[in-house]
Every structure is written in C-alpha cells, then in structure tokens.
Amino acid sequence: MDPSKVKIPPMKDLTVDNITENVIRINSLCQDERLKYVLERLVTHLHDFARETRLSTDEWMTGLRFLTEVGKICSDVRQEYILLSDILGLSILVDSIDHPKPPNSTEGTVLGPFHTHDAEPLTPGASISHDPAGEPLLVVCTVKDTHGNPVSDVKIDIWETDSTGHYDVQYAGRDGPDGRCIMTSDKEGVFWFKAITPVPYPIPHDGPVGKLLKLLGRHPYRPSHMHFMFEKGGFDHLITALYLRNDPYETSDAVFGVKDSLVVDIGKAGPEYAAKYGVSEDHALLTYDFVLVSDEETSELRARNSKEALDKLGRKVKIVNGLPVPDLD
C-alpha cells in the first residue's frame, strides 16, 4: 500500500477518549462492508471493556500470555480455542444466532473439540463402539422436516466417549476411529445403530482453559451425552446432542450445551423393539425424532431475528448475504 495514494485520516494526540473513534476511522477504509461492521463493533466493545474495567498493563499482558498458551496446546486432535469459546458460552451463543430454530424443530448445541473427519460409514444396526466395558445401547431415531415428512439420505455423523469418558482421539495409541460413525437415513427417515450408554466426563482441564475454570471455581464436567451432526442439501446444517436425564451434571454443564428439548430417558427395548431389532427385551433403548429445518426457513428466520435484535439497539441495518451490515441509504 502506497500511503501517498490512500486517504488515511491523520491520527495524532490520541487519548483514552478519542482512540476508539480513530481506530474505527482508519478501519473504515475496508471495502468489505461486513468485515468493516464486525471490526467496528469489536473495537468499540473491546475498548469499552478496557475503559470500564480500568485494565492494567499486567492484566493485559496476562491475557496475552493466556491466549498464547491456548494456541500452543492446540493440535490436530485437541482444539483448546474451541474449549475456551465453549466455557465462555460463546459457542452456544453463536450457534443459537446463526442457526435459529422454529418451534418443534430440533435445537442445536455445541460441536465440542472432539469431532473428527475420519469416521467410517456403517450400515444400519452396526455397532459404533468396541468398548466391552460399556453398557450396550440400542439407538433408533427418525429424521423429519418441519412438516412431518420423513427425510431420506441424510448424512448423520455420530460420536461418543467410551465407558471411561474418553474419546478415541484422547488415546496416544489410536489406530482408527472408534465410538463414532456415519449413518444415512433410509426412505422412512430412520437410522439405527448399537452404541454404549453415554457417561459424564471432564473436558480436558490440564491446559490453560482448565486452569481458568479452577480460578473461576467451576468444575470441568459435561453430562452424559451423544453427539449428532446432520447434513443434507436444502436443509440447515444441524449440530446437536442428546443428554441423559438426571445426570449429576445436567444443570451445570461446563460448556452450557444442555437444552430441555434435548434431554432424553433411557428405556428398555420391550417386546416390539426386541423382535424388530434383534435384542433382548431388557436391552437399553434410546429413541428420538429429529426435525430438520430447510435452508429457506432458516435464512428467513435468521434475517428476521437479526433485524428485530438490532432494531432494539437502535441500529439501522440491511441484510447482505444473510448477515447484517449498516444501512446507510
């Protein structure tokens, strides 16, 4: 960039009171309206935070060192930044904003740091876990749209821990995926598989995020759950999970992921399911009916929610590519 050819506003004599407007002014050279808007709001809130808390140099440097340590511990199988976002409630907030749900559809929740891309496609009824110590569980689910129609050929990514509360990627000797798979819904929207009953477990707390939780007086535990991710053209991407009722951490999830509509009971197969799926009548059973939202429904709801929320803040915006930017017309 040649400074002589760019209209850069003069920035001198910067103070506590005028630094924010000057940073925003020079960032306004950005041609990307969305990026410019995001940075304008970020700088505003970041500077207001520093002014409101009277942030000290030592605290500022402590924060920078903390973020450096978060980055250092990240790897292909451990994403500490996702953990940080999770324990601050940002992950669930962003999901709720970007993937709004109409009534009676399945709510989303956090992805977590242990999803992988090497899960293998399995046929209906296959077992996703090879843990002999886990309590066997039959899982039978349906996928429908918001009008009650079955949705076939949905790609469903599923993952859970073993009976000790560890995901496969947490083992140094991992030689392939376990406790995870990819299923596809049939023409009736049904998919079913054999798993083990989920157990509660702590998120990794041997790193900087764990140290932060300890300083805050918070525990690192997540309630018993099983992850699901749904993908099909024409439908909004759904990341969700099912949580077991009466788990000791049901109301204090370290990453704020539990929603009432996602809390389920483990029952028994009984005569009907036992005969149909080849298990004993007292075999543990989990059933759930997932409801996907179309891209069109999601786009309309997201735009409406954005306009309403920002109107309340007195901000005039327009929707561009599904996201709000200032409306200067």
Curated annotation (Swiss-Prot):
EC number of this enzyme: 1.13.11.1, 1.13.11.37
- Binding positions for Fe cation per the UniProt entry: 167, 201, 225, 227
Following inactivation of the gene, the phenotype reported is: Leads to reduced growth on protocatechuic acid and the accumulation of hydroxyquinol, when prcA is also deleted.
Cross-referenced Pfam families: Dioxygenase_C (PF00775), Dioxygenase_N (PF04444)
User: Which cofactors does the annotated protein need, by name?
Assistant: Fe(3+)
Similarity comment: Belongs to the intradiol ring-cleavage dioxygenase family.
Q: What is this protein called?
A: Intradiol ring-cleavage dioxygenase hqdA
